[in-house]
From Swiss-Prot:
Record-stated family: Belongs to the Maf family. YceF subfamily.
The protein's name in its UniProt record: 7-methyl-GTP pyrophosphatase
GO molecular function, one term: nucleoside triphosphate diphosphatase activity
Reactions catalysed, as given in the entry: N(7)-methyl-GTP + H2O = N(7)-methyl-GMP + diphosphate + H(+)
Keywords, sorted A to Z: Cytoplasm, Hydrolase, Nucleotide metabolism
UniProt GO BP: nucleotide metabolic process
Enzyme Commission identifier(s): 3.6.1.-
Principal subcellular localisation of the protein: cytoplasm
One GO location term (cellular component): cytoplasm
Gene3D superfamilies: 3.90.950.10
Length: 202
């Protein structure tokens, strides 16, 4: 449980996001947001809200909910959506879902929309969205099966059923965008803003 003296709270229980920020030198305390993401997202469907805007809505909801409980601490909230044409993908629930994701993405270009929000006193102070363009090579169903057998349930941890920092890189033909955007944490603009706010040493 974070305390009011924590340097920065991460509104997430993701060990990967926490490790990424700690490796960058941030003092992080995780706190799970009390947010129903699908309930927030459902009213946005069919309204013309773009996938990057959906990511921002969810990131802001996470950050401000936790910030309302810890108003004197900087809170980071993040979210990432994967969009293919007009579809927004969610994390696969099982290995069959992961297979369907990869088959749908095979040979096509999709986008990873990564939003990050800084909040304090229950209010969003700063928001940022970065977008990466991901082109997957045409992948045969048999290879997808072998790939999923090798990576196992790690495939269920990401919205695209792949981890670009691991064997998932073999699925791709080209990537346009910052590495940290691809993994869901636009770290460079976040660090720049934290330095500007004097929340970290700069």
């Amino acid at each position: 449980m974070p305390t009011e003296s924590s340097t920065i709270i991460l509104a997430s229980k993701s060990p990967f996001r926490r490790r990424l920020m700690e490796d960058a030198g941030l003092s992080i305390m995780p706190e799970a947001p009390r947010v129903d993401e699908r309930a927030l997202e459902a009213p946005l469907e069919g309204t013309g809200v773009t996938p990057d805007e959906v990511a921002l809505v969810l990131a802001e909801a996470k950050a401000t909910e936790v910030s309302a409980r810890y108003p004197d601490v900087w809170v980071i909230g993040g979210d990432q959506t994967l969009s293919l044409d007009d579809l927004i993908f969610h994390k696969p629930k099982d290995m069959d879902g992961a297979r369907r994701h990869l088959l749908a993405l095979s040979g096509k270009t999709h986008f990873l929309n990564s939003a990050i929000v800084l909040a304090r006193g229950g209010e969003a102070v700063w928001t940022h969205v970065s977008i990466a363009r991901m082109t997957m090579r045409p992948v045969k169903p048999a290879f997808i099966g072998r790939y999923l057998a090798r990576v196992g349930e790690k495939a269920l941890e990401s919205v695209g059923a792949y981890q670009i920092e691991g064997e998932g890189i073999q699925l791709f033909e080209s990537i346009e965008g910052d590495y940290f955007t691809v993994v869901g944490v636009p770290l460079l603009p976040l660090l720049a803003k934290l330095r500007e706010l004097k929340a970290i040493d700069g």
